[in-house]
């Protein structure tokens, strides 16, 4: 299956970021002041004054391959991540990723290889349960899982950390899988009703 992402929820907006920045003077928003929000956000982003962008959050549910999983785990500041654990449960769905830019014969080869590993995973897990107990069986049988195996992760960014994630992962030099994930996340944020982060995204050149 393909990697997938869902936007579960969000908090904040361009106004949230602007009011946070203006707390040092006055949070009251006049009509004239409201009109200056795009300019303010652009200045904050370009000058590196990014603390106000920490006041909003974006909450995603993703299903990704192990390589993309590792890319996500490298983002620790302003990011909260929980994920499926093969140590605590048997991964019965056998989700796995096949690169869609490969020749068909290689896609089929990886599909077959991964399916063999998944079958052995379940077989060995059940056998080890008899000799080593369920806990040890789950945490060690997973060594049969391939790098293409997918897990589901609950990921929440504040907007500052999301912008940093996009800078690194929505880049031509990033691995295809994580670049596509970042692009889909960005698309979902842009499609939010009312476009609440329109000027913040423009401030960061998205």
Model-predicted regions and their roles:
Residues 1-206:
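Family-specific signature for flavin-dependent thymidylate synthase
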């Amino acid at each position: 299956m393909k990697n997938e992402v869902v936007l579960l929820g969000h908090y904040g907006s361009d106004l949230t970021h602007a009011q946070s920045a203006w707390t040092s003077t006055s949070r009251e928003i006049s009509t004239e002041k409201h009109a200056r929000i795009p300019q303010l956000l652009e200045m904050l982003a370009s000058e590196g004054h990014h603390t106000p962008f920490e006041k909003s959050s974006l909450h995603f549910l993703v299903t990704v391959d192990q390589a993309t999983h590792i890319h996500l785990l490298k983002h620790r500041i302003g990011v909260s991540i929980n994920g499926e654990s093969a140590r605590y449960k048997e991964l019965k769905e056998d989700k796995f990723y096949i690169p869609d830019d490969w020749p068909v014969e290689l896609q089929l080869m990886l599909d077959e290889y991964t399916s063999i590993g998944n079958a052995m995973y379940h077989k060995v897990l059940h056998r080890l349960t008899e000799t080593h107990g369920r806990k040890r069986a789950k945490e060690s049988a997973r060594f049969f899982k391939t790098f293409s195996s997918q897990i589901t992760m609950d990921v929440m960014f504040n907007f500052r950390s999301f912008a940093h994630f996009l800078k690194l992962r929505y880049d031509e030099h990033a691995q295809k899988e994580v670049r596509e994930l970042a692009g889909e996340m960005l698309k979902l944020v842009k499609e939010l009703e009312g476009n609440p982060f329109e000027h913040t995204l423009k401030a960061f050149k998205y």
